[in-house]
Swiss-Prot record:
Belongs to the TACO1 family. This is Probable transcriptional regulatory protein Synpcc7942_1017. GO terms for molecular function: DNA binding. InterPro entries: Integrase-like_N, TACO1_YebC-like_2nd/3rd_dom, TACO1_YebC_N, Transcrip_reg_TACO1-like, Transcrip_reg_TACO1-like_dom3, YebC-like. SUPFAM superfamilies: YebC-like. Gene3D superfamilies: 1.10.10.200, 3.30.70.980. It holds the Pfam family Transcrip_reg. Keywords: Cytoplasm, DNA-binding, Transcription, Transcription regulation. NCBIfam families: PRK00110.1, PRK12378.1, YebC/PmpR family DNA-binding transcriptional regulator. One of its GO terms (biological process) is regulation of DNA-templated transcription.
Amino acid sequence: MAGHSKWANIKRQKARVDAKKAQVFARLSRAMIVAARQGLPDPAANFQLRTAIEKAKAAGIPNDNIERAIAKGAGTLSGDGRQFESVRYEGYGPSGIAILIEALTDNRNRTAANLRAAFSKQGGNLGETGCVSWMFRQRGVVQLTGAIAEADLLEALLDLPAESYDLDESGAIVYCSIADLEALSTQLRQLGYPVEDSELRWIPNDYQLVTDGEQARSLLRLLDTLETLEDVCSVTANLELPPELVTALEATL
């Protein structure tokens, strides 16, 4: 993790700002809808749903809203005739940065039009299905916060279903297979590690370094715009920036 700032870490730096935005409730609600749609609507039997509910409660979302989101995902919400579907979109930003977007929508045409407009405004373009997805793979991600002793973490991970990890002064990110996410998160908690988040995440196979300030600014504006669109659940890019450039751009993020 040392040396350059990858998009996953840039997102973490932006989290405090993003958390203040009104879209946070909608984003967390969509996460619950997706989790309930993809698995059982019972959080005790659905790790992703349970995690999404924990995040929603931590953000102060009322229980009624949580129950409504679960019912919507399960298709049992009365009076709501909309049919939602999970859709993946792909495109390129400035400097040829690959961008993968997951959305939950009841109108593909509306979502695609909004995404296309966002890409065009910042010099990117929405691509065809498959144009960049081969550059990413989905993995389980457990995020730890606070000062983590690398030697102790490495020793602990030798006995856990972890594949790799990144570490810096703010915490650690531990990666695993999709199937091992729940077990890894649970076992790290049991060992006393401060687990902040557990989720499935698309991880770039390789990162593309951008050193031009204007290109980087346009990319960050594009990614921020995409993340605030109503139907968007997640945005992933293979972007890597030098830390000094991130520092210079922090005021504009």
